[in-house]
């Protein structure tokens, strides 16, 4: 469950380390975002000589949340951290590698490139 001002880890090699959510996309008064939702983020920490710089405003898709996600079969899935993958305006990932597991809910949201790059899909 991600809202404005939430700081997330970045789970790709785009060069950003930490990002802060500045807007949840989808609806004028939408407050929370979960796994698979697209948000607007500001880069708070970045590696030197990387594709993204500190202060850049980008879109990102949430791949892991500490708040549990309820599945259709009644099971729950939660992770140790809140993480996102930076994406372009064409909804393609900016990085070429994904670190750590990602949730299966991304498949229903048509983020197949992220699913194929991820080392593990839970």
UniProtKB/Swiss-Prot annotation:
Q: Which domain of life is it from?
A: Bacteria
- Gene3D superfamilies on file: Ribosomal protein L14 (2.40.150.20)
GO molecular function annotations of the record? large ribosomal subunit rRNA binding; structural constituent of ribosome
Read off the SUPFAM superfamilies from this record. Answer: Ribosomal protein L14
A GO cellular component annotation here is: cytosolic large ribosomal subunit
Q: Which keywords belong to this entry? A: Ribonucleoprotein, Ribosomal protein, RNA-binding, rRNA-binding
Q: Name one GO biological process term.
A: translation
**UniProt keyword rRNA-binding present:** yes
**What's this protein's function?**
Binds to 23S rRNA. Forms part of two intersubunit bridges in the 70S ribosome.
Write down the HAMAP family for this protein, in alphabetical order: Ribosomal_uL14
According to the record's subunit comment, the protein's assembly and interactions are:
Part of the 50S ribosomal subunit. Forms a cluster with proteins L3 and L19. In the 70S ribosome, L14 and L19 interact and together make contacts with the 16S rRNA in bridges B5 and B8.
Query: What's the family?
Result: Belongs to the universal ribosomal protein uL14 family.
Instruction: Please identify the protein, giving its name as recorded.
Output: Large ribosomal subunit protein uL14
Chain's gene name = rplN
